[in-house]
Amino acid sequence: MCTAVNTVFAENNNRGDTVNIKIDGSKANTSENFLYRGQGMISCNGSSRLLLDYKEKNPESYNKILEHLYGKNGLKFTHFKVEMGADVNTSSGTEPATMRYEDEKADVTRGAGFQLAADIKKINPDVTLDMLWWSEPKWVSDSSDVYAARYKWYKQTLDAAYETYGLVFDYVSANQNERTVDTDWIIYLSKTLKSEKDCPYDYSEIKIVAADECGTWGISRLMMKNKELCDAVDVIGTHYTSHSDDNTKKLAEEKGKEIWFSEGSSPMNYAQSAYRFDEGKSGLTGLNGVLDIANRMITMVSGGYMTLYEYQPAVAGYYDGVTYCHKQLINACTPWNGYYTLDSGYYMNLHFSQFMDKGWSFIFDACYGDAKVGGDGHALVDAKYSYITACSAEGDYSTIITNTTSEPITYNFEIANLAKADNEVYVWETRGPDEGQEYNANYFKKISTVTPENGKYSVTIKPYSMITVSTVNITDYASDAPAESENTLLALPYSDDFGYSDEFLSSRGNAPLYTTDEGGAFEVAEKNGENVLMQKITKDIKANEWGGTPDPTTNFGDDRWYNYSVSADILTDGEDSYAGIGLRYILADSGRSGYSVTLYENGNWIFFGGKKKVLDGNIADFDSSKWHNVKISALNNDITISVDGKKIIGYKAEEGGYSAGRAALYSSYNNCCFDNVKVEATDSVQPYVNKFDNFDNIFTYSENGWEHSTMDSFKNYKRTISHGTEGAYFTVDFEGTGIILTGVQKGDTVVSIEVDGKTVNKEYVISKISNRQSFLLINGLEQGKHTLKLAVVSGNCSVDAAQVLYDYEAVNKAVTNETSSVAESTDSSDSVPEDNDKSAKSNGGGSGKGSFPFVPVAVGAAAVTAAIGAGVAIAKMKKKKD
């Protein structure tokens, strides 16, 4: 039995590469505030937005994703926290406010968070709920009594969550996320909740979490000095550190306060291919890698007394390219096909969740971590010995161990005072691939069963791996995640006239399908009796910034769209207002991305390449009271723009073009409107690309001259990039009709280029360009297998990704009869509405459901035989300057 209370942690009982662990059940800590709480997730910053579309278009996938997170056969998360949005960007996107005006009834159908909470509760009713604010509505911050106004926002949101979804919140996080601790507000909130009588359930039972600082524990110091504050706070939570200070530990030991890791990272590494270049060839190492995150979850126990780890995010339910992207346990960004992936971090967390249940007691004598803070300040480095142990009241126990060293380590176990001390133990392992294996071949595998002798046994952990040693016996784990072939395209043409049903709109705060807002709030609204898409945030209600918010921007679609056009009917809204459209949207960190055009109410227009203004002009006799049709088209490096059917721009991108990406809509902070949005292919042969990371196996690098970064900026695709110096080279083996290379460049680099063994250009000059821009386009090859070789002649060349063009028509012809019959039987709501060729706003028509012809097109290099063209064209060829 686990009975005693003890917070003495394991000493360094390590002898060389052997560690002695004594697991003594009599030394387990059964104090309630020290019990294991498990893991949770935070829905914030737009990170869950696309899950609403999974729910609508592919409910089976949606339910599976939630089961993976909260189900008994998945991660068994125990906690869920939702951002109380304010329509400003809080890193990777906006969360809509429940109350934009003081006299507005709180609407918790806006955003994904509260609806997710309701659906999670259906899976596990015991999940605890929390909510936290990054910014607050303008009417709150402008109030003469901010605390009273803020409390009104809190309370009416709690009321609406119960009224709409039956949600009962267990916690509220009081302080503004990662900002100065406001002790008076924390006390005010606690007191007012405790005295609240007008409530659908007992709000006095809601516990207070504070103060969500980033890596610091100022709240603990303040609590030690202020009894009223100390009494108000039930849980001390902070972000991105596994080590708490003495004040915090004292509050846990003497005052019974719970300590939480109230926001922590998911792994960021691209394990699928990083194993080729990371330390140990595992795909699991390095800063912010799988083993780093596992060490944070282990060290937080001995180093911080923390009992709950909250992932931000657990699910990447947003598009690629947002700030801090490629950070998730589950990736879910293609709701039209229901595809998602369980990333390496998911399997890491299974080592905890499948063998330790909420309420287990830590045996602190068998918990240890010697990692140091390093890298970006969040990471733990130089860990050699890292492990935690917990037990159940029934006498089961589990120990989780990591090894981030290059040598195996043997752990000698001695078990005492536990009912199952002599039971068999099961060893589960996660590590990188052996030669010739798939990257995930050794994820979460049961590798041995050990029978103790007199309560003693030994287990050896391999380098760059993690194991769980447990008396808990679970069945072999088999993922039912979709196969890669199911990641089908959002095929063109695609259109949306926003004629959704009232039932659909009311279920999701008037959000259309597939859009993710980076600034502002784009919602379906009625205009002159018709549904349109309207930007709802105006300057007078724009909340104070948490970080930085671009002008209103939303984006949607498939990252693999390449040669296509975007058109929309637009209506500006008053003086200095503008509305715009864009394509090839790839990075959301600053609002504008790819190519875009904005049209002002006075007839002025501006054409942008990324954030840079490229061209501008004016349309004479422009009538801003009328709808106008704007269209932007891309065909390889050629961009054309028309207004009301009249061409105003013809532009060829010569330096650092933008390749495949999504569509976007732009607005000023006015109620500008959009309708009849259409996305159409401009090339029936090459409308799409297949994307590959520079670490994927189609790339082969010379042994010398390359520096491979497995954990870089989110501005790089998959956070990877390779830098080559003079003499270095790489080859890319691809199947298609052309290839695009992308990556940030310093400029003045000269490379030589070969295609299929033939020199195409000996002195190709690469100019200075930004992240994810293209520096090479080769096109016009016959459909088939090809090899590109690029060698650095002088300077430095970086490569981030490849985009392979292919003959889409040939792939379509190769679709099986079975697939064709599926497409033919697709519901009419997924068909393309007739194009009535109106250059301005049409009167009805279309499904209003983000319609597209469902054509399953498998990603990857398709084995097709059709040929197109015999020549080779290289965009932006230059001779080296004399």
Task: Place the predicted regions along the sequence by residue.
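Aromatic/acidic polysaccharide-binding cleft in carbohydrate-active enzymes
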Residues: F261-H378
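Flexible glycan-contacting loops in extracellular carbohydrate-active proteins
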Residues: Y651-D675, I769-N771
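Glycan-recognition surfaces in beta-rich domains, encompassing non-catalytic CBMs
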Residues: Y464, N671-E818, V822
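Short, aromatic/His-centered strand-loop micro-motif at the edge of beta-sheets
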Residues: G609-N629
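Secretory/extracellular carbohydrate-interaction modules
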Residues: T538-I606
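C-terminal beta-sandwich/jelly-roll accessory domains of carbohydrate-active enzymes
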Residues: I401-G520, V524, D540-N544, K613, ...
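N-terminal catalytic cores of secreted or lumenal carbohydrate-active enzymes
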Residues: N13-F169, A174, T183, I187, ...
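Carbohydrate-binding surface patches
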Residues: D370-N423, Y464, A728, T737
